Every structure is written in structure tokens, then in C-alpha cells.
């Protein structure tokens, strides 16, 4: 039989105090909704339907082309949300997973186990449960003396006795699809919230003598539903521990994993060394035996093998094997550094390609440049690429030497093997093998200093 999935993502998330729909808040680099969608993929659903509501267009944009959408214009409870999927799923034979889009810690393995449990026990409904010493706020699982599930009771509707139950409802279920939509026609809003509860379906199945089961999570963390910023931070912390643990198992060394922040889609090769306070975001890839020191921040970039990045920022760029960057360097978007390049302290590279073995040791700005191999930039070199309205390109050939404190005003080209004298301002192309000196000739005025009031003769 087929599997189907319903993801509930219509809520506003008032307690988040945000204009962004709750399910779009990020955990480890991607939205909570994307985490849930990826985990749902473990059951290989034939159809996935996402229920949207508040700012539906933003939610649909995240999963565009990956799921069908239905709109819950008025949020009248979880049961009502599932009713919205009726035009797509009613009458189909199979098993339907219902899951909230604000549960980013649920794993695909647990959802697969839930489906298998449901099928193997021939249940009409199976509840994913968890156990906790602090069940306040959760729906409780009420069982009979034979440990069979009788019903789920919400916190506001629970008796004092029921509030003591430690087994809680995680808000994730599997149903026989056909029976689910039949039962939904019989639920009502006679409860403290005045809403249609999906949990009332469980009571209907019990009344008709149908089999209802519960599969208990091994890890309570997976049950976390994020309703505010506190829970969001908790989810971030748990996810970060999972991610770092995975990388350590795969051969990556962490000095302090609790102070290292790695997004879920980052790829890291074995033998990489990561110091504390390193952040790796987005689609970043790190090659083998690279060292990332304290304070390094990398976004959507590829770093090759054997590189050393020291307390620097790299954004949307590529760094080849054996490159050294930093400390305090900034590689801005759309830059590429060839093999064995050295970018030293207080150097900024922006929108530039730099050939192998080129060095910019300190206090240099390289913007909108095409730089060849074996180039040396002296301290204080500035490429001037902006005239207040337009940006221009500088082309520097192979084996060029740029003396310290030089200013290169684009558009300009420095030919292969050329040399720029220290302190020069370059405004014209420099031919290959030429020396360019663009500064005033030094003039010494003998004895002139004796006329100045601060000279010792005038004290």
C-alpha cells in the first residue's frame, strides 16, 4: 500500500513575535519546514500535501515543486487542517502520516519506524508518543488497564489525574487514509479551544472497536515543537550537537564542539581541524586536512585541501588547495583563490580571481581584479575600482611585482613580469617586462628644516 504525508504549516506562530511564518524560522541553516520535509522523505510518500495559511506564498516558495499545497484560510485546529487535504487524499488506499511543520528535530528514522510499527500491528491509527517528567502543555495518552490507547486528552481538557500522565502526544500520527477522512466527518468543536482536534479521531476509532496503537520515541528531543524563541534556541542547540557529532564520527577534529556552529548542509572531509568559535554556513565545503582557527566565518564557499584559514571571513567564494588566509582577512563574494595563494592580515578581496602562488601579505584591497600567478602585492596596495557610479576591472598578469603603498586605478592592465615602484599611482596600462613609476621625484632642500619653529636651533 502507498504512503501519504500531510505537513501542517498554516499557523502564524504568535509567540514567535515575528512577521515570518513560524515554520520558516531556521534551525542549522534551513527552515523548520525543510527539516520536516526531509525527514518525511524517509517514508517515500506517494503524495505529500502541505497545509498553508498565514503568508502562504512565503511557505509555498520554500517547497515549490516538491509538494502539493492546500490552504487553510481560517485556523480552526489540526483536525480542520487535515480536512483541507480531502480533495487530494480522500478515497485513496494507504497510510497517511500527519506531522506538524514546527518539529525540526524529528528524524527520518523515527518516522520510518512509526510507519513500520503501524503496518506491522495492523492499526487503524498510530500515535507517535514520548515520555517526559514535565508533561505540562502536552496532550496526554490515556490508556486502559491493558495498556491499550483509549484517547488523547489536551492539557486544557485534562482532569487532575490525567495531568499526571507522563506519556505525551507529539502531534505526529499515522492513519489508515480512508478511515481518517471518514472519521473527520464526525468530529466537532465541543472543547475548551472551540477547534476541530485531530486527536478526536482517536476516540472515534476506539468507539467503533478499531485498533489504535502508540509508538514511543527513544529520544524525547525529537518531540520538540517550536512555539517560541526559547524552543527555537533549544532546537538549534540539539541540532548543532547532532551535526558536530556526525562530523567527529567521520574524522573531523573539534577543539570545542559546543562553541562551533555548522549548518546542516555543510560538507567536511576527514582530518579537518576546527577550533572554537568557527561558523560554517549554507552550502560550504571544506577539503581534507584544512585548519580553521578561532573566529573563522565561512558562508556558501568551497575551501580546498590543506588550507589554513585564520580568524577570517569567506563569503560565496572558492579557495583552492594549500591556500592561507588571515588573520583578519575578508574574502567577499564571487572571488576565487588559486592553489598556494597567501592572503594575509587585513587584506580584502572582492569579486576577484587570483592565480596560484600569488601573495598579498598585508593591508591590501583587491577588488574586481583578474590576477595571474606568482604576483606579489606589497603592503598598502589598493586597486581603485569605483568612480562613484561605475565599477571597473583591473587585469594583472603573471609574475608581476607591485611595490608597497601603490594605488592602481581601474580600468588598467599590468602586463606579465612588470613591476610597479613603491608609492606609485598607476592610471595607464603597464606593458609586459616594464617598470612603472607613478610618483613625484624626491626633492631635498638643504638646511630648510632649520627655518621651522620646532627645530632645536629655534628653541
From Swiss-Prot:
Molecular function terms, GO-annotated: glucosamine-1-phosphate N-acetyltransferase activity; magnesium ion binding; UDP-N-acetylglucosamine diphosphorylase activity
Co-factor remark: Binds 1 Mg(2+) ion per subunit.
Active site: 362
Reactions performed catalytically: alpha-D-glucosamine 1-phosphate + acetyl-CoA = N-acetyl-alpha-D-glucosamine 1-phosphate + CoA + H(+); N-acetyl-alpha-D-glucosamine 1-phosphate + UTP + H(+) = UDP-N-acetyl-alpha-D-glucosamine + diphosphate
Cofactor: Mg(2+)
EC number: 2.7.7.23, 2.3.1.157
Top-rank taxon: Bacteria
InterPro entries in the record: Bifunctional_GlmU (IPR005882), GlmU-like (IPR050065), GlmU_C_LbH (IPR038009), Hexapep (IPR001451), Hexapep_transf_CS (IPR018357), NTP_transferase_dom (IPR005835), Nucleotide-diphossugar_trans (IPR029044), Trimer_LpxA-like_sf (IPR011004)
Binding site for acetyl-CoA: 379, 385-386, 404, 422, 439
Biological-process GO terms, alphabetical: cell morphogenesis; cell wall organization; lipid A biosynthetic process; peptidoglycan biosynthetic process; regulation of cell shape; UDP-N-acetylglucosamine biosynthetic process
Keyword Translocase: no
Residues binding Mg(2+), per UniProt: 102, 227
NCBIfam families in UniProt: glmU, PRK14354.1
Family of the protein in this entry: In the N-terminal section; belongs to the N-acetylglucosamine-1-phosphate uridyltransferase family. In the C-terminal section; belongs to the transferase hexapeptide repeat family.
Subunit structure comment from the entry: Homotrimer.
Name of the protein in its database record: Bifunctional protein GlmU
Source species: Streptococcus pneumoniae (strain 70585)
Native organism taxonomy: Bacteria, Bacillati, Bacillota, Bacilli, Lactobacillales
Encoding gene (name): glmU
